[in-house]
């Protein structure tokens, strides 16, 4: 099933002292080292000759899973988890290959955290590197193989290794090279030097680690360069946890005038940034380089050498290390996402206005059938510009954010709503104010906005100097002006598009891509439906989703149902843990005939369901937040049940469901409102 040629390389890869591997590690030579198959899934099978463990796909069906669970682990120091694996495929399964997922399971959480996923088939072994932040909490590693199409494909694990340290560190003494890879070039590439490897064209150095011919390092030589500006790149594993500090390494350069040795970072969006360049050849010995390195979001480090011709000599690299302590004479650029964000529930946070007079007013509107509330909870505060207290011809309202350090990439997200403007030009715009140059640059302005819908905007920006974000609303004439609402401003490090390429947060569902892990007892016209935009029936249902205003939500279409008919949406089975759970979600109940929305807890092996929360009748034209705190130490499911009311104006919707470990930080008023008819609504099963 597996390519036998892979085994020869693996025997060199696996450590001779496999039995002494640290906790959380296994070379699968004679045992699975405490990693066990979960009985309710397909088994992982240890190869008779050792070397690897695999999933037998010959009898499995597409979509079936094989789950491997580690013993209890603890990472009190920063650790690196490396996985050597292979996914093979057949010609019939190219469109739907098998998949390998790696999760982290904490003892006090009902959901597993997806750390990594891969489904790229390969004819040789591959390596994945994952940074694990230090934590006092115990956890398990869960490895899940999902079968693709065809029964000749395979999923195999050759080694799992968990060691103290950072995945970006490497001395190049092991065959897997710590997950560093060379970007292949026909003429110039990075090679392993030292040991028994010798190059006849250049006099290469001894390695730095052992300072002998027994050690290894990486080098790139110009002897095969055929063109000017030939480039060789050595690419590190992608960082998977935020880190900042001092990145150090040793290097040697021969004939430095004919080559350029540089260090870059590259994020998941493909954006490069040069963070270091060798300014002189250095001496004949190994030279130490220390570089201030910050990876608040996933990125790779790229060691790049550019040659100007075949006489450019060589560049050698060894002993890459990282320390969370910053380099000499360097200080960390302090940035706090919390201090740079605001939902205006308590005050303006670190935002402020022009001294000439307040243009933005912090308001709280009790939502009803005619007025929408804030975006955060539906019942809280937001900012309003062009109110009756500020609106005047030529009025300009400016809201300044806190100072942001320069030379960092930021993602700005906020929600806004526009009411009553005849023209959208300059209704709301965002500027970047460079403090040192007193220059403002417009980076966004509203083009169109449906009335009464909270819309999300997201902007990625980066400036070399310290900056501030400025929200500006302009009222050119009294007759053209309406209201501008602003809420839930967040500023985070990294590109806004980065989140699309990261694993989704555990226990969260926005319904943007699909229904997540929710299922339905019955799926027909009277079921829960995933939708974007307005619902078909007027005077009921939301105009847009809660997440972005233009995304998806789940709802029942009352015109397809009869009075008392119900639809049920079930979560996947959740692990029972000790302590409190907090379930939050947003619900929309607008329409004169609105029925009931209930949330139930169903415990494993119990026929009865416990009611956790309920709302009945028309609530508001707004999305409202619900918080439910509950406890359950047994496996269980959460059920969202919507019941159609007395008329077709009974659409009910939910969005942005989130499960969290621990108690809810705040609890809303649990007073239930009544629409005047029976609570059970003559429930009908269909």
Swiss-Prot record:
Cited SUPFAM superfamilies: Concanavalin A-like lectins/glucanases
Main subcellular localisation: secreted
Modifications the protein undergoes after translation, according to the UniProt entry: O-glycosylated.
CDD domains for the chain: MAM
Signal peptide: 1-18
Keywords: Extracellular matrix, Glycoprotein, Repeat, Secreted, Signal
Region (Disordered): 521-543, 665-686
Residues forming coiled coils: none
List of glycosylated residues: 134, 329, 524
Domain MAM: 24-169, 168-329, 340-498, 507-666
GO cellular component: endoplasmic reticulum; extracellular region; membrane
UniProt-annotated location(s): Secreted, Extracellular space, Extracellular matrix
Pfam families: MAM
The keyword DNA repair is assigned to this record: no
SMART domains for this protein: MAM (SM00137)
Cited PANTHER family: APICAL ENDOSOMAL GLYCOPROTEIN PRECURSOR, MAM DOMAIN-CONTAINING PROTEIN
Protein name stated in the entry: MAM domain-containing protein 2
Native source species: Homo sapiens
Taxon lineage: Eukaryota, Metazoa, Chordata, Craniata, Vertebrata
Gene symbol of the encoding locus: MAMDC2
